[in-house]
């Protein structure tokens, strides 16, 4: 046990911190925990040896998993929380397929208007479904807004004295600003699947079927 004032403000569970400072939707991220999931980019949990190798060499080798596409119909009722959508995805997937088609695969979430925190709620949950990784496909405007949120949170960390000698946090803000400019100019839109992308399975979640709060 340590006193609260011995920790920097904005210090948080590591996955949450990493999500707040992730500014590249095209990034491939690995971390030494199954809950290494982000709202931007695709993040894999890996064993400690793989993570150590990546830190030492900048490279890592792993098999490329199949993907499962998740789309949504209907609309959220006023009384619904986004966690209800997450739980409904699991419930309806199991009803549609009779088995966990997420296991060992990359879940590709198609709600283009999910801001960073909601997207992280979804991707982090996929670890509980034994998915290898997950990614949220964003619309350009939504991604820009999520990047602005990231810039704001990184600036708070800077203001609280959390910057290092290499000015990493300042450089992350610069990367976010560059990415926003690329999206606005059309030079590099938000990451999206190819038109001919193939999936191991396609799950359709009907939001209209969620008529009461759900718990895990």
Model-derived features: where do they sit?
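Fe-S-dependent hydro-lyases/dehydratases of central metabolism
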Residues: 2-216
């Amino acid at each position: 046990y340590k006193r609260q004032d011995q920790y920097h403000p904005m210090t948080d569970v590591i996955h949450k911190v990493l999500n707040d400072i992730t500014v590249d939707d095209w990034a491939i991220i690995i971390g030494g925990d199954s809950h290494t999931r982000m709202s931007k980019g695709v993040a894999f949990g890996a064993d400690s040896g793989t993570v150590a190798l990546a830190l030492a060499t900048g490279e890592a080798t792993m098999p490329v998993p199949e993907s499962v596409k998740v789309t949504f119909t209907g609309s959220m009722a006023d009384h619904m929380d986004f966690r209800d959508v997450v739980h409904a995805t699991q419930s309806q997937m199991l009803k549609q397929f009779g088995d966990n088609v997420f296991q060992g695969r990359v879940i590709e979430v198609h709600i283009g208007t999910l801001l960073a925190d909601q997207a992280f709620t979804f991707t982090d949950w996929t670890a509980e479904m034994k998915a290898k990784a997950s990614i949220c496909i964003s619309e350009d405007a939504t991604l820009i807004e999520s990047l602005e949120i990231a810039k704001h949170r990184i600036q708070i960390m800077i203001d609280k004295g959390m910057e290092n000698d290499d000015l990493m946090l300042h450089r992350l803000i610069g990367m976010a600003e560059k990415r926003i400019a690329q999206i606005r100019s059309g030079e590099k839109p938000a990451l999206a699947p190819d038109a001919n992308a193939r999936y191991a399975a396609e799950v359709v979640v009907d939001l209209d079927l969620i008529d009461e709060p759900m718990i895990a």
